[in-house]
């Protein structure tokens, strides 16, 4: 099991194939992604690597994190994320990862925060059918109807599907195909849509339900080794 990557969603575009057909893709940018820390079985009870994305201004970083970055001699980072890895896929702190970590044709899982839609009704939020257009129904056409039955149980249970805040949730899209990789510009192009809006940070990892691509570099594709 390899580490994943942290990337920024730049937006969507399309790629043209040799036969003239086009493929919609989401462009992800891997910006100065470095290994910040390593979790070990002996010390932490599990094996993982902590990655840091982009460079942050020192004034925007808390004092504990400043010391954390200084200890491994890396610039302060905007975003930190951990990825569980196998014992033989551990990377040294300070190593810089490349978008070439993934290869064309490989399947990946992408995790991010979905776009916030604000307060939404039951029809939009949960795909409810709503009430009838006529036959005695007035004003309540888009309502969700009864929520508590009658005297028994006489209450609305927790987690009942009702109107409320839609979006702004952690969402993972599975088995997206890598359509193109630009190692020089550190760009990753994934077929289809990815959760979140423009400039949202996303986590990209090998698809958990598919075997790892035979040509994918193991344990990782590095721009520069530690130190």
From Swiss-Prot:
InterPro entries: Ribosomal_uL3, Ribosomal_uL3_bac/org-type, Ribosomal_uL3_CS, Transl_B-barrel_sf. Keywords: Methylation, Ribonucleoprotein, Ribosomal protein, RNA-binding, rRNA-binding. GO terms for molecular function: rRNA binding; structural constituent of ribosome. One of its GO terms (cellular component) is cytosolic large ribosomal subunit. GO terms for biological process: translation. Methylated by PrmB. The modification N5-methylglutamine is found at residue 151. PANTHER family: 50S RIBOSOMAL PROTEIN L3, LARGE RIBOSOMAL SUBUNIT PROTEIN UL3C. One of the primary rRNA binding proteins, it binds directly near the 3'-end of the 23S rRNA, where it nucleates assembly of the 50S subunit. HAMAP family: Ribosomal_uL3_B. Belongs to the universal ribosomal protein uL3 family. Part of the 50S ribosomal subunit. Forms a cluster with proteins L14 and L19. This is Large ribosomal subunit protein uL3.
């Amino acid at each position: 099991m390899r580490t994943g990557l942290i990337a920024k969603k730049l937006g969507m575009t399309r790629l043209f194939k040799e036969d003239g057909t086009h493929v919609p893709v989401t462009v992800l940018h891997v910006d100065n992604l470095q290994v910040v820390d390593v979790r070990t079985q002996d010390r932490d009870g599990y094996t993982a690597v902590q990655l840091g994305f982009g460079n942050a201004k020192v004034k925007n970083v808390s004092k504990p994190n400043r010391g954390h970055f200084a200890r491994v001699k890396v610039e302060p980072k905007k975003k930190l994320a951990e990825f569980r890895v196998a014992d033989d896929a551990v990377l040294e702190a300070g190593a810089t990862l490349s978008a070439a970590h993934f290869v064309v044709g490989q399947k990946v899982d992408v995790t991010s925060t979905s776009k916030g839609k604000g307060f939404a009704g039951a029809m939009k939020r949960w795909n409810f059918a709503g009430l009838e257009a006529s036959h005695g129904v007035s004003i309540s056409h888009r309502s969700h109807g009864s929520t508590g039955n009658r005297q028994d149980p006489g209450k609305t249970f927790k987690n009942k599907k009702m109107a409320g805040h839609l979006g702004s949730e952690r969402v993972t899209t599975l088995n997206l195909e890598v359509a193109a990789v630009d190692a020089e510009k550190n760009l990753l192009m994934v077929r289809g849509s990815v959760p979140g809006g423009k400039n949202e940070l996303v986590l990209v990892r090998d698809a958990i339900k598919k075997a790892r691509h035979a040509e994918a570099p193991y344990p990782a594709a590095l721009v520069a080794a530690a130190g």
